[in-house]
């Protein structure tokens, strides 16, 4: 049985997550390290986490950084016939991807599942029934964006007051303030 289903995202005050295939804000090294640590760390000996992303998100990662190392990389696409070079798996939908994690080739290898973008994949995950956590980095200013994070339904999602391994105080890099939040739903 695969562990928890999670989304991880950094989002500006105006809910932006991307611009021209890149992040809308300058690179924030410690925020990126947080993403690496959260998506890579497995709590189960001998297992790896699975990162699920849409095709655009995959191609927005610099080629030298693909696949995201130390993680099993799965790309979602209805157009592609085989996984893009470097990706480990391809699925047509999030449901198909989650079914794949129950197959023998992955069931014993995958610990946590992390959804890393983009908008439509986040939306599909957030509307998925069952237990889901959202790891949201709130970038505390507006940035011009062309890609946005879906609205978080606070009827369904509860902001957790604290979470192990997640700093609760405001961070600052390059004059940009941000904070880490964790939301959880169980329906």
UniProtKB/Swiss-Prot annotation:
GO molecular function: dihydrofolate reductase activity; folic acid binding; mRNA binding; mRNA regulatory element binding translation repressor activity; NADP binding; NADPH binding; sequence-specific mRNA binding
Keyword Kinase recorded: no
Enzyme class: oxidoreductase
GO biological process: axon regeneration; dihydrofolate metabolic process; folic acid metabolic process; negative regulation of translation; one-carbon metabolic process; regulation of removal of superoxide radicals; response to methotrexate; tetrahydrobiopterin biosynthetic process
Presence of the UniProt keyword Cytoplasm in the record: yes
Any single GO CC term annotated in Swiss-Prot or TrEMBL for this entry: mitochondrion
Pathway assigned in UniProt: Cofactor biosynthesis; tetrahydrofolate biosynthesis; 5,6,7,8-tetrahydrofolate from 7,8-dihydrofolate: step 1/1
Function summary: Key enzyme in folate metabolism. Contributes to the de novo mitochondrial thymidylate biosynthesis pathway. Catalyzes an essential reaction for de novo glycine and purine synthesis, and for DNA precursor synthesis. Binds its own mRNA and that of DHFR2.
Record's subunit section: Homodimer.
Protein name: Dihydrofolate reductase
Native source species: Homo sapiens
Taxonomic lineage of the native organism: Eukaryota, Metazoa, Chordata, Craniata, Vertebrata
